[in-house]
């Protein structure tokens, strides 16, 4: 292609999961894209747990795939174990989770980026974003990003910039008394950019995360541990894949004990978190083992999962034993666990805190409100998790591409936005920019009020055609979706026209109350297994199980789904009422000082967003609504 450094449309800063999806999206939409990262060989690393997916997280991975992203395909290519979580519960909270070969995963990410047209990789550290409307003191008031500056002094121009710095922006690693400016153990932090952003007027904070030690498989006795049952059939994340044929690796369940806890209690004073050296807030739902022991003193044990890091490595990941205690204490602590009495640690557990950009300074398109053309995604926005990062990354990449294109064509910029009823990604971004964060944000099904519509099996139905319309998704994906929808209609027709017979009832006693009813009507009975109905008809049994289950769920929960649709229609009216970008809230008499301050800080885009803000009363919403209607 041969375009020079001055020719880029989009620059992505950082090569983690957010950066990879952002760069791929922008490049695939035809924009000349540069991904700058400190170490090209570290692109796409699974820095912590060797797994992808989980409750609500698996939904996000499938949404990324439906949008034309790659995380689902990477996961399929590296899968070594598959489990559908919450199978005994309702379909709204079921989600796929896989163990991944972490080294193969990173190779796939790097190779895909290298092979993508319109995309270049460059190894350097970005220390500043050059903006218009910058004062002599470096402050920016509603300027526009048009270049980045690197540590080696290169100035590279761009029409849009996406920041995906992960834990590296001003990162510091802690292990007992050891402390170093690193974003990941052994990898130096990115200095300069955080200070540059503060100078421009951005409000920054610090958050913390951590990771457990890794041990050698040959040094532990897995035979005394409980093998974790996995699903017999590996199912793909990507809608482009039909089946997965890969080697399987086992995970194991273990527990801490009173000896473990006593050792930890005796060494609380050596933890940098308890001594006050780490002041940043950590992830509530993934606490360190010392935090668990301190908060739950009556617990006699805490569950651990022993997980393989890949097929071509002997390293095991001890899920549940995150720590920042000194290495000598980690050695002793791990050896109190059954089967690990002679464990050899290859990499110690550690904590890392890092700089974040408070996300209320972003619009719903993940563009900063202070600097147009500057987007951010992933842990810099206060989230935790590979999946949350990837979900933000693809949206930031799409919108950076659309913004860059608009500056070339001089046409109006129309951002790509996912609403709360369209995707978990939409829920997450709305939460971040509307409510902000005071701790690392993790996605849960409970955060989504329309989760019956946001099931993992419907991600393609919700998002694929939207992605195709903006030039990101392939036509083959749309054709696959259309085939699936035709199949669903065929299944529905068969369920509506076939009835439960006496023969069926004699074979299955639970069908007796439903003799003469259609299969569809029978499915509304929650005690009737979906698979039972499929087995009653040879034609139905030949259809893909996942597609049949999707139809069955929609029939069984149609009244709940209809109620959600009504609620969505009501909310849409509020979302349709826009608030001008520089609206003067001081003009509204009757608005409390607290509410006015919050509104001026967040600068919501719509009345619907105002209603979801923290500390905003219904009366405030009505006052604002009345003023806008004048």
Swiss-Prot record:
Which UniProt key words apply to this protein? Cytoplasm, FAD, Flavoprotein, NAD, tRNA processing
Coiled-coil positions are none
GO molecular function: any one?
A: flavin adenine dinucleotide binding
Q: Which residues bind FAD?
A: 14-19
Q: What is its main location?
A: cytoplasm
Q: Name one GO biological process term.
A: tRNA wobble uridine modification
One family from Pfam that matches here is SAM_GIDA_C
Q: Which residues form the signal peptide?
A: none
Q: Which cellular compartments is it found in?
A: Cytoplasm
Q: Where does NAD(+) bind?
A: 282-296
What Gene Ontology terms describe where this protein resides (cellular component)?
Answer: cytosol
Cofactors that this protein relies on: FAD
Determine the domain of life of the protein's source: Bacteria
The UniProt family comment states:
Belongs to the MnmG family.
Functional note = NAD-binding protein involved in the addition of a carboxymethylaminomethyl (cmnm) group at the wobble position (U34) of certain tRNAs, forming tRNA-cmnm(5)s(2)U34.
Quote the HAMAP family the UniProt record gives: MnmG_GidA (MF_00129)
On assembly, the entry states: Homodimer. Heterotetramer of two MnmE and two MnmG subunits.
- This chain belongs to the protein called tRNA uridine 5-carboxymethylaminomethyl modification enzyme MnmG
Organism ancestry: Bacteria, Pseudomonadati, Spirochaetota, Spirochaetia, Spirochaetales
Report which gene this protein is encoded by: mnmG
